[in-house]
């Protein structure tokens, strides 16, 4: 620390007279072994530390220096340029302008790229684990590009050194907008200023003096009592970002989140149309649907997620309704159908539940034995807690938001049974002829018994066609389903018709023989309903009659 202080002050840095860097006694210090402590009370609005622009490590300086080796560094990725520059500066030793600063920097880190196999056991199945693998791949590619640009790279310019340099930037960098007001933001290093530890919500002012001092300044915003540590505030960062970038976590981080990525099937119906709606209305890309579940469940955030999922899961009929609505309104004012609401909530629950289940199943059954494992466990445990809290919240939200639909019935399942096409219709007197035929083949018309046969889909197609044959007598209207989907024969529908013809139509002519409805066109129609409109709820398939 003495070398850094001497070098920093020589290069124009300023340090409040009551600030002293002392050896930390905290075994779990977020950064190195020194902390800044107030030797006397420090009033608000006092300059704590400053770093001149000239002493900062910036992209412009790195680029100009590396262009001496190869002019092609002019157009090189700024991250590669910065990491290569710092790595090469570290090899200069005492000849470097930043020798004292580089000597002070940690020689190793607690970020996931420094984890060994035992450490990684605490990260398995987390987003940070896969993010670390991706980062390693990117940095390998960057290192290879740096080697190709260097005319005569020394053997000491290793990939490990590049990782070290890149981690210095991820753990200590500031934005270049502090120095260059009107340029595109790139990372910069501010020696001495970056020595303060992070504390969420810490009032601190970052000031840039472009006139007199030409320096970046950290200014106190509240009294710092004698003996207290001075902190910086990196902003509202969750534990995943802290672990990946800085190598530590906060046990009760108010800004912690879980990143939830929704995978879209490549054969999603109406994919292009849905992508356009999401991009135009919500600025979401269908190919990269990423949501952040907060530590404290937030209704507004979940509503935004559900709006997006209502588009993703929309049936053909719902998509037409949504498209018409968007001619005069926006997605926020759109009220999905009951099917759309349930489907969105079910999909969200499925994703959250599967993430939580994955983390719980891969949870190490041993206690952490290293600092890295401690941070990883804090991160992992917090992810599990957020997911479990989100599951509870979504279930309660689902109950509250749908309750007005099914009241005065006791629950949603009963409402669906009474207002949907499902195998529960086999208990209705109107379906007695069909029930006898199904019971002859399957030995039962009990809903749970039929689900257990794994032939619920084929039975649903049959029930849909039967509903068409008695549509005027049904306890609910299926007119929107009839109007919304054309009864046109298609190859898949013809194939299903042949199966039903052999299983039912030919064997039970007393039920199906006299009706004109049991044909290839209507089976194709029913297949569309099952593929596009069906909803799985409590293990049963329902096709809700739209209203």
Curated annotation (Swiss-Prot):
Cytoplasm keyword on record: yes
Main location: cytoplasm
Membrane spanning residue stretches: none
Assigned EC number: 2.1.1.-
Similarity section: Belongs to the class V-like SAM-binding methyltransferase superfamily. RKM1 family.
Functional summary from the UniProt entry: S-adenosyl-L-methionine-dependent protein-lysine N-methyltransferase that methylates ribosomal protein L23 (rpl23a and rpl23b).
Annotated protein name in UniProt: Ribosomal lysine N-methyltransferase set10
Organism: Schizosaccharomyces pombe (strain 972 / ATCC 24843)
Gene name as annotated: set10
């Amino acid at each position: 620390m003495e070398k850094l202080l001497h070098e920093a002050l020589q290069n124009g840095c300023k340090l409040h007279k009551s600030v002293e860097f002392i050896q930390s006694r905290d075994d779990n210090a977020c950064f190195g072994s020194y902390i800044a402590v107030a030797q006397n009370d420090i009033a608000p609005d006092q300059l704590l530390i400053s770093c001149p622009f000239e002493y900062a490590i910036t992209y412009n300086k790195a680029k100009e220096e590396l262009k001496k080796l190869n002019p092609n560094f002019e157009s090189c990725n700024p991250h590669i340029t910065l990491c290569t520059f710092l790595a090469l500066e570290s090899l200069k030793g005492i000849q470097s302008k930043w020798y004292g600063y580089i000597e002070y920097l940690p020689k190793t880190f607690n970020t996931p790229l420094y984890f060994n196999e035992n450490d990684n056991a605490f990260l398995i199945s987390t987003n940070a684990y896969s993010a670390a693998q991706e980062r390693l791949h990117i940095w390998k590619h960057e290192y290879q590009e740096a080697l190709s640009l260097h005319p005569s790279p020394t053997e000491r310019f290793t990939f490990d050194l590049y990782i070290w340099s890149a981690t210095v930037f991820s753990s200590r960098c500031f934005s270049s907008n502090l120095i260059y007001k009107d340029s595109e933001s790139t990372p910069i290093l501010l020696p001495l200023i970056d020595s303060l530890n992070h504390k969420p919500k810490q009032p601190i002012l970052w000031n840039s003096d472009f006139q007199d001092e030409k320096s970046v300044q950290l200014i106190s915003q509240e009294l710092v009592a004698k003996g207290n540590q001075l902190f910086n505030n990196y902003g509202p960062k969750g534990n995943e970002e802290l672990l990946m970038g800085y190598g530590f976590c906060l046990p009760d981080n108010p800004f912690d989140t879980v990143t939830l990525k929704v995978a879209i099937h490549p054969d999603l119906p109406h994919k292009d149309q849905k992508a356009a709606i999401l991009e135009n209305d919500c600025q979401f890309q269908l190919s990269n649907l990423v949501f952040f579940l907060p530590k404290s469940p937030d209704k507004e955030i979940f509503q935004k997620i559900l709006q997006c999922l209502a588009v993703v899961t929309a049936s053909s009929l719902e998509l037409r309704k949504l498209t018409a609505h968007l001619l005069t309104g926006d997605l926020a004012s759109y009220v999905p159908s009951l099917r759309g609401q349930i489907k969105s909530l079910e999909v969200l629950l499925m994703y959250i539940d599967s993430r939580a289940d994955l983390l719980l199943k891969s949870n190490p059954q041993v206690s952490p034995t290293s600092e890295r494992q401690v941070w990883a466990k804090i991160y992992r445990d917090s992810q599990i807690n957020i997911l479990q809290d989100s599951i509870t919240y979504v279930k309660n939200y689902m109950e509250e938001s749908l309750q007005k639909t099914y009241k005065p019935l006791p629950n949603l399942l009963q409402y669906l049974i009474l207002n949907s096409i499902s195998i529960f219709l086999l208990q209705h007197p109107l379906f007695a002829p069909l029930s006898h035929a199904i019971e002859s083949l399957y030995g039962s018309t009990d809903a749970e018994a039929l689900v257990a046969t794994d032939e619920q889909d084929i039975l649903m197609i049959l029930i849909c066609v039967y509903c068409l044959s008695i549509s005027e007598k049904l306890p609910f209207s299926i007119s929107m389903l009839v109007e919304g989907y054309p009864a046109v024969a298609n190859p898949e529908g013809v194939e299903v018709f042949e199966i039903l013809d052999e299983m039912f139509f030919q064997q039970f002519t007393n039920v199906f023989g006299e009706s004109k409805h049991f044909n290839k066109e209507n089976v194709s129609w029913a297949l569309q309903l099952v593929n596009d409109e069906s909803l799985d709820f409590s293990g049963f398939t329902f096709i809700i009659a739209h209203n």
